[in-house]
Amino acid sequence: MQGKMSFIIRGGLMEYLVNSREMKLCDFNTINKLGMPSMVLMERAALAVVEELEGLDLGKVLVVCGKGNNGGDGFAIGRLLHLKGIQVEILFIDEEEGCSQETKEQIKIARNYGVKILDQVEFNKYTIIDALLGIGLSRKVRGKYAEIIDEINKTSAYILAVDIPSGISADDGKVLGTAVRAHKTVTFAFKKIGLVLYPGAEYAGELVVKDIGINHLGFEKSPKTYSHTPEDLKLVPKRRPYSNKGSYGKVLVIAGSLDMAGAAYLSAKASYRMGVGLVYIYTVEENREILQTLIPEAVLTGYNRVDLDEGTLIGRIKDARVIVIGPGMGISKATRKILELVLREADVPLIIDA
């Protein structure tokens, strides 16, 4: 399987999200184990971006390139736009000697085709393609790169980021000093975590994932990070018209303590959102009024913190199909007694919060 990838997780489809290390491993294995030349991947990345630009009134295009492979993508994009007859210029402020080998090759090809490569421009004249910094960025952007990013953000131009907006961490979405605010980001093969988490998601604008032939070879068997896809919603079964709430599971939520009603409320609410039909809440009597106001559909049983009625609790335990215990309960004697009782009496799955 190549490109956009979904894993089967307990019967559902989950879209895998990669960090920078995982993405680099996918690149490495595609090139070194499967034999796909890196220049071919770079060319396919450039074609994917140019394809995404079709139909836009581009006017004059500025491709801002760095010295890494993200910049190499940018030089290839500039060349392809040039061959389409679009007026394009490339801003490159680094020394060519410091570039990756692939980027050096792309610079050479762009020059051979007569693409203009400049070291200074007026940013407000262009549609801007951001190919300055890629997913490998791990420290704050400073100096001339920071100045360029700030100039890009000052313009009213349409901005498209290549793979990730320059200055955004691919691992967590943080702004590393400063970052490009893009209208659209075309990322390759898989979504990066930093494009889904904020503020990275905001800086990315519209997110488009393009398959360029990178294989998932090297992924771990169980994804570390993944998100739901629209296909997941199709897996949620429709409720039968002749069913009742008891047909869709009974969860016992044992949670909360004095002045800690929120944990019980959130646990019960989460149960309903996951499709549970009937939720029982077992909490201290003092939480009754607020919980019956916040979540009146739940069946609430309050207990006396000093004189616990074990029979009532055992009845609730025997009626439940899943038991949640622990959120917001504290470390009182009553909590210990309740936990011991649940561990002894329950023969259903337990979700225990430490």
Q: Across the structure, where does each feature detected by a protein language model lie?
A:
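A short, aliphatic-rich alpha-helical micro-motif
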Residues: 122-126, 179, 317-318, 343
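Short gly/ser/thr-rich secondary-structure transition/capping motifs
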Residues: 112-118, 142, 166-170, 232-237, ...
